[in-house]
Structures are given as structure tokens and as C-alpha cells.
């Protein structure tokens, strides 16, 4: 009898319906450029997410840098909303820079939301009483983001700044994103929109967001276009385009 006859080849097979556990969370360090305290933020990222919340993207870093640099104008004493926050880095920077309140949102996936809350709970220099972390679906009723009471929302209940960092690649969601911006930003506020072209062939679809915004009574004002090290250097296709980081303000015209 051969040795093979004694081997149960199904011994280590996964049972039917088995789902492997998700990868464990990992950490990424963000270094503030202005060297003020805290000089470094240690961000926990989810192990894996179909919503791409497991990566610290260039657009998020650029957004954080920009808000830190222009905090006196955009952040300090202001009401701030972030959409699609992933690890919540821009919101954390707003909190550290003494915003009046920051509401940090992402898709209501429990892993994503609990991970953002973890980063808030472990961030040095943050006044948690002025922060809210919650799930939100773009285009939905935005009133719960601003006020939980029954009163009608007024301009003063809305946000001075709405942050959209690396969201415009969701081309099917442009109208919902813009509706939420229209519903939540103050007449004298603005939206900060930052993105990198992850799919170079669809760059024009990304940029369509800044034309469509006019239908919602916004004017797009370009802030900057910089070139950074791309996220995935092993992908040689159109590396010069993927290295770009675009930034715009959407300014209300109503």
C-alpha cells in the first residue's frame, strides 16, 4: 500500500461557506509640514476595503497639508464637514486646528466608521466634544449632519467648509455628492475638492464634476495642480497623469 493511500486530501479544505477573516488593520504616519504639536499623526487604516479606505491617498495628504497651512482662513473657529473620509486625516487636522466643530463621515460600513472613531479617540490635541463621526450616504437627507432637532435648517446651521478628498473618481455619484454639498454648505462657505486621476483614460469624466457643479449653483475655482510620487509606481501606464493632484474650491453662487 502506498503512502498516498493514507493521506486525506480533504483534511485542510475550507468548509463550505467559509469566509476568511479580513486582513488586520495597519498604520500609516502623517508628518505635519508646519512642525507644530502634534508633529505626527499615527493613523490606523482598515485592513482592506472595497471602498478604498485601507489606503492613505495622495489627495488626502495634500488636503491635510493645505488645511494645516491655511487653517486661520479655512478652519479655526469654523464648522467643517468631510465626506468619504476614509481614515479621517483632513478632519483630524481641522480638529487639531481648533475648528468650531467637525463632522467626519463615510459610508455607513461598521469597520470604516469604527476605524475613524479609533483615530479620533487616539489623536493628541483633539477636543472630542467638538467632533462627530458618523455614517452617511451621499445624496441622502443631510439634516442629521447639521441638527438632530425638528427645527428647519437655516444657513447658520450649515458648514463653512465641506471637504471632498479623492471622491470624484466615483463618476456615478457626482450628482449625489453635489446635492449633499448644496444642502450642507453655507452661502458664504466653500467646498474643498482634491483628487488624483486614478484612471487616466477617464480624466475627463473626473473633470466633468467641475462642470456639473454649475447645475447646483457652484462656481469651480482651481487652486493648484501639483505632481507627486504616484501611488502605484509599478503601473507604468500614464504615470505622469496618475502623479497629478488637482485641487479646487466650489464657491456658492446663490
UniProtKB/Swiss-Prot annotation:
EC number: 2.1.1.-
GO biological process: methylation; rDNA heterochromatin formation
SUPFAM superfamilies named among the record's database cross-references: S-adenosyl-L-methionine-dependent methyltransferases
Principal location: cytoplasm
Cellular component GO terms held in the UniProt record: cytoplasm
Protein role: S-adenosyl-L-methionine-dependent protein methyltransferase that trimethylates the N-terminal glycine 'Gly-2' of elongation factor 1-alpha, before also catalyzing the mono- and dimethylation of 'Lys-3'.
Protein name: Protein N-terminal and lysine N-methyltransferase EFM7
Originating organism: Debaryomyces hansenii (strain ATCC 36239 / CBS 767 / BCRC 21394 / JCM 1990 / NBRC 0083 / IGC 2968)
The gene coding this protein: EFM7
